[in-house]
A protein has these predicted regions:
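Intrinsically disordered, low-complexity, positively biased terminal segments
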Residues: 1-7, 14-19, 39, 50-52, ...
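Conserved catalytic-core motifs of GNAT/GCN5-like acyltransferases
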Residues: 103-107, 122-136, 257-269
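A generic, well-ordered mixed alpha/beta core segment in the N-terminal half of proteins
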Residues: 90-96, 105-107, 112, 120
Length: 288
């Protein structure tokens, strides 16, 4: 614990304090649940600022393998802004990542990107958050491709497939998402090998689809359309802007763009991280 100024105290933010941190993301209108906070704080490291017994600022760093760590949840309560809290916590998160010998990555909001650029973060690719209301029709899988429910026994093969295409070692993230929403988890196979997969999770305001990783746009569309065919209520998905065909299909079925993100890194990104060609949906800006 370290005193900053006045009533502000900086201290570690731990999984046991997830419920106390949740109002920060809820106030910002973000989609994370207490379960999401708890997972990220258990798997990664958090730092926060408290005032009068409540959390008024946060930042997290989630390791995604030996080379990469994802910074997220850089939040400051509205009534505590303009006191340097966000900048301080971002610096602390960057230091945590560097001390571990990793490269820092993040998905910046349109408002956040100008804040990150002076720190040395550089753009990789643009992403759009799309919101879809209600179901959409399921599309056929390409010839030779079969889609079935993803089971826990599939995680080693799915994790290896994902790492080779996302440059992220995030098997704990995949296992968490499978546990949160097993009914959404699907795997596509062709010639006895993984050709794609999709996972999802319930959020505070909408169900989030992702990650969606596939060998082709056709496989990705078959996977995501099956999830949407069973949708009840609002669904969100974060799609790299490069995937025009998927975006066109989603737009045709009522998708509305909510906001944009920019994937960024501080330092040289791991090989493949800047390649969005097989990343059709993010796990979310907080999970990579």
């Amino acid at each position: 614990m370290a005193a900053i100024e006045g009533d502000l105290l900086e201290e570690p933010l731990t999984a046991g304090q997830a419920e106390g941190a949740l109002p920060l993301s809820a106030e910002a209108g973000w989609n994370q649940t207490a379960e999401d906070w708890r997972f990220m704080l258990r798997e990664g490291r958090g730092i926060g600022v408290r005032a009068a017994g409540r959390w008024v600022g946060s930042a997290l760093a989630l390791p995604l393998g030996a080379r990469l760590s994802w910074i997220s949840m850089v939040l400051v309560a509205k009534d505590a802004r303009r006191r340097g809290i966000g900048t301080r916590l971002l610096r602390r998160a960057i230091d945590m990542v560097r001390d571990a010998g990793r490269v820092a990555g993040l998905d910046a909001t349109e408002l956040g990107r100008p804040v990150y650029l002076p720190f040395g973060f550089r753009d990789l690719y643009a992403i759009s958050r799309l919101r879809i209301k209600g179901p959409a029709p399921a599309e056929a899988a390409p010839a030779g491709c079969a889609i079935r429910p993803l089971a826990p026994a599939d995680l080693p093969a799915v994790g290896a497939f994902d790492e080779a295409r996302s440059a992220m070692e995030r098997r704990s993230v995949l296992a968490y998402l499978l546990e949160r929403a097993p009914e959404t988890a699907l795997v596509a196979e062709a010639d006895g090998r993984v050709a794609g997969f999709v996972l999802g999770r319930p959020g505070r305001v909408a169900f989030q689809i992702g990650p969606l990783v596939a060998e082709s746009e056709e496989v990705a569309l078959a996977l995501v359309s099956r999830v949407l065919s069973r949708a009840n209520g609002h669904t969100i998905i974060d799609v790299p802007d490069a995937h025009a065909a998927l975006r066109t299909w989603l737009d045709r079925h009522g998708a509305m763009r909510q906001r944009g993100f920019m994937r960024m890194t501080l330092g040289k990104p791991p090989q493949g991280l800047a390649d969005a060609s097989r990343i059709f949906g993010l796990a979310g800006p907080e999970l990579g």
